[in-house]
């Protein structure tokens, strides 16, 4: 495993292009585009203010930079660096901006969610969509880019509108049986739309493309409900994470629950492999001691080593006592993601923040648990194979695969605190992001990594 040099970064804004050829990063008001293979700077663009959001067009030819405080969006072209577009929403303000799937239209959401403005880069025409709902996930596109679903709120009721992306004509408009709609998401095959309600009302609804209600699912009443939702890439399963610390798996045939995964603090099953991160301070030999002691700032002292150990059951996981009299308590399933082959599901229970649970979806059972020394900040699956990358806000990267686990120290002066990460679409590298910097991590082939994992006490 190799690492690149460290580059400057602002606001964790660093994204690979969809075609995998470029890497865009932001340093305050500057946008830097690099070649992924050489990391040489290809283009350097200067925006009018500090960049708060970036997004590549689907064809990787354009990149959007949003400056919400100024109500501005600037669009840059990689093929024609001298060309650029500026969109000023003026007094209407700006709270969100995204590309349409064709990469030639930009959707801007104005302040207070009064409307969505659709700007065409080709014809310079402008269209308006009224009544967008202010919710966590209110816009979703089908994978083939043909349709857009939009959550709306009008006359104190929730609605969903489905638009044809080629001409922005309204295809379907229907009300949803929700108290306060929180999110919508298309299945990867584009046939079913999942709609879920506020956490105060446990309800998830499944609609067809023509607006027919296919099914409604509710696990319980009178308690905090849904916290997270994820489709499997195969569209066969819908995972619903709840505030009660369980994940419920719905199937695509009957839309009924086929199983539920609990997240207890104690693991007693000897068939479950529990990997515990262990830290060991390096032993300083007599030759390593210096007299007098080194001055502050004279160089970093040897850092502690980290590795995984297989814990013997029963295992008690570290829990966090939630503050229940405040909003958004740290309980329930806050993170969940399917592997690209739909074989595995990774989850995190927010009141057991140091643990990542990996579930075998084929056998509908718990496969492994990874307990870190620090709370898990983020995890993401390799796009090409069942390999999970994890970061905890420290200077280490953690990898899990069915072959086992490994912990890798990120090199560099001082501590490189990995706050987030994103895979390259090839699965051969990933970007590691800290508060003010980023670097690239290059991985060997799966055979080499698998061998390394087994040497570190892996389990198959």
UniProtKB/Swiss-Prot annotation:
An example Gene Ontology biological process: mitotic spindle assembly
WD repeats: 46-86, 89-129, 176-210, 221-260, 328-369, 371-410
Gene Ontology cellular-component terms listed: centriolar satellite; centriole; centrosome; ciliary basal body; cytoplasm; microtubule organizing center; MWP complex
Record bears the keyword GTP-binding: no
Top-rank taxon: Eukaryota
Subcellular location as annotated: Cytoplasm; Cytoplasm, Cytoskeleton, Microtubule organizing center, Centrosome; Cytoplasm, Cytoskeleton, Microtubule organizing center, Centrosome, Centriole; Cytoplasm, Cytoskeleton, Microtubule organizing center, Centrosome, Centriolar satellite
Main location: cytoplasm
Presence of keyword Repeat: yes
Phosphoserine sites (modified residues): 281
Expression tissues: Ubiquitous. Predominant expression in heart, brain, liver, thymus, prostate, and testis, and barely detectable expression in lung.
Keyword terms of this UniProt record: Cilium biogenesis/degradation, Cytoplasm, Cytoskeleton, Phosphoprotein, Repeat, WD repeat
InterPro entries given in the database record: Centrosome-WD_assoc, WD40/YVTN_repeat-like_dom_sf, WD40_rpt
Quaternary organization: Interacts with SSX2IP.
General function of this protein: The SSX2IP:WRAP73 complex is proposed to act as regulator of spindle anchoring at the mitotic centrosome. Required for the centrosomal localization of SSX2IP and normal mitotic bipolar spindle morphology. Required for the targeting of centriole satellite proteins to centrosomes such as of PCM1, SSX2IP, CEP290 and PIBF1/CEP90. Required for ciliogenesis and involved in the removal of the CEP97:CCP110 complex from the mother centriole.
Protein name: WD repeat-containing protein WRAP73
Organism this protein belongs to: Homo sapiens
Lineage: Eukaryota, Metazoa, Chordata, Craniata, Vertebrata
Gene designation per UniProt: WRAP73
């Amino acid at each position: 495993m190799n690492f690149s040099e460290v580059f400057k970064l602002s606001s964790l804004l660093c994204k690979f292009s969809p075609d995998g050829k470029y890497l865009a990063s932001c340093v305050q008001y500057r946008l830097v585009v690099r070649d992924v293979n050489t990391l040489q700077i290809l283009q350097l663009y200067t925006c009018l203010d500090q960049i708060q959001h970036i997004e590549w067009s689907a064809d990787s030819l354009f990149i959007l930079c949003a400056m919400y405080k100024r109500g501005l969006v600037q669009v840059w072209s990689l093929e024609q660096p001298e060309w650029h577009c500026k969109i000023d929403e003026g007094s209407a303000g700006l709270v969100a901006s995204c590309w349409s799937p064709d990469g030639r239209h930009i959707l801007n959401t104005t302040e207070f969610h009064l409307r969505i403005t659709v700007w065409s880069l080709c014809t310079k025409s402008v269209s308006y969509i009224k009544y967008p709902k202010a919710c966590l996930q209110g816009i979703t596109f089908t994978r083939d880019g043909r349709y857009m679903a939009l959550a709306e709120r009008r006359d104190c009721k929730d609605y969903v509108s489905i638009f044809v992306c080629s001409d922005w004509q309204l295809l379907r408009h229907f009300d949803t049986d929700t108290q306060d709609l929180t999110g919508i998401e298309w299945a990867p095959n584009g046939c079913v739309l999942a709609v879920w309600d506020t956490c105060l009302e446990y309800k998830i609804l499944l609609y067809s493309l023509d607006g027919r209600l296919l099914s409604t699912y509710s696990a319980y009443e009178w308690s905090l409900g849904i916290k997270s939702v994820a489709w499997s890439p195969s569209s066969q399963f819908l995972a619903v994470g709840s505030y009660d610390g369980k994940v419920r798996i719905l199937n695509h045939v009957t839309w009924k629950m086929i199983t539920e995964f609990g997240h207890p603090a104690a693991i007693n099953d000897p068939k479950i492999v529990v990997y515990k991160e262990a830290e060991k301070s390096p032993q300083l030999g007599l030759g390593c001691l210096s007299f007098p002691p080194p001055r502050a700032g004279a160089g970093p002292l040897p850092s502690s080593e980290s590795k995984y150990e297989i814990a013997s059951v029963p295992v008690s996981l570290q829990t966090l006592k939630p503050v229940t009299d405040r909003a958004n308590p740290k309980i329930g399933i806050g993170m969940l993601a399917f592997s690209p082959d739909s074989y595995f599901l990774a989850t995190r229970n927010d009141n057991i923040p140091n643990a990542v649970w990996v579930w075998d979806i084929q056998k509908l059972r718990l496969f492994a648990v990874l307990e870190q020394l620090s709370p898990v900040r983020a995890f993401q699956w390799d796009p090409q194979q069942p390999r999970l990358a994890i970061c905890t806000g420290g200077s280490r990267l953690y990898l899990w695969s069915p072959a086992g686990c490994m912990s890798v120290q990120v090199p560099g002066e001082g501590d490189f605190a990995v706050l987030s990460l994103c895979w390259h679409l090839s699965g051969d590298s990933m970007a590691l992001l800290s508060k003010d910097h980023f670097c690239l991590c290059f991985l060997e082939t799966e055979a080499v990594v698998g061998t390394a994992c087994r040497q570190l006490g892996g389990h198959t």
